[in-house]
Amino acid sequence: MIPALLLAASVAACPLPSEQRMIEAQLFFGRDVEDRTLVGDAQWSDFTATVIAKTFPDGFTVTDGDGEWRDPKSGKVVHEPSKILLVAAKPSAVLTSKLQTVMDAYKTRFHQQSVGVITREVCAAF
């Protein structure tokens, strides 16, 4: 579960008047499915449309990545293409729930052990 610390942003005053305190979340989605196949572009597009866009209708960014991690079960180093989702939103319990929903949906749909996540307090304006 994503820590409830998202509720209490403690960034110092934002430097630009138009900025406000937000949480920046990066989610890392491995595209290797059980060492047999990759989550294809069409499958990713469908996941983006049916899960991510509906969960974050105010906007998000997706980039391609190239990741490497050690499988805790086998000890094997896995190298795989990935997608990186970037979301910036006001800190809240709702944000925490939305991030967890997207992570859980991806793990279930594509048989993944995990989805990586980094959250940090930032100042942002759109």
Where are these regions (language model features)?
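Generic marker of residues within folded, mature protein domains
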Residues: 3, 17, 75-77
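Hydrophobic helical h-region of N-terminal Sec-dependent signal peptides
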Residues: 3-7, 11
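Intrinsically disordered, low-complexity boundary segments flanking structured domains
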Residues: 12-16, 48-49, 72-74, 101-105
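N-terminal secretory signal peptides
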Residues: 12-63
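Short, internal active-site loops enriched in acidic
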Residues: 32, 68-69, 122-123
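Short, intrinsically disordered low-complexity segments
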Residues: 53-82
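Helix-rich interaction surfaces within compact, conserved domain-sized segments
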Residues: 77-126
